Amino acid sequence: MTLFQLLREHWVHILVPAGFVFGCYLDRKDDEKLTAFRNKSMLFQRELRPNEEVTWK
């Protein structure tokens, strides 16, 4: 079985997990951007009361 035949028969088994991993990577990068914005946002700049949980989880 050549490499070309192997790729032709199993391309779904390669691309679907690769797409999932790439999507997870992009999601984490987007979360980092949103976290950086949240830390600069006037809405979340106030001090939390005692025993108050953060609203962004």
From Swiss-Prot:
It holds the Pfam family NADH_oxidored. Belongs to the complex I NDUFB1 subunit family. GO terms for biological process: aerobic respiration; proton motive force-driven mitochondrial ATP synthesis. The gene is Ndufb1. Keywords: Electron transport, Membrane, Mitochondrion, Mitochondrion inner membrane, Respiratory chain, Transmembrane, Transmembrane helix, Transport. The chain crosses the membrane at residues 10-26. Accessory subunit of the mitochondrial membrane respiratory chain NADH dehydrogenase (Complex I) that is believed not to be involved in catalysis. Complex I functions in the transfer of electrons from NADH to the respiratory chain. The immediate electron acceptor for the enzyme is believed to be ubiquinone. GO terms for cellular component: mitochondrial inner membrane; nuclear speck; respiratory chain complex I. It is a single-pass membrane protein. It comes from Mus musculus. Complex I is composed of 45 different subunits. This is NADH dehydrogenase [ubiquinone] 1 beta subcomplex subunit 1. It is found in: Mitochondrion inner membrane.
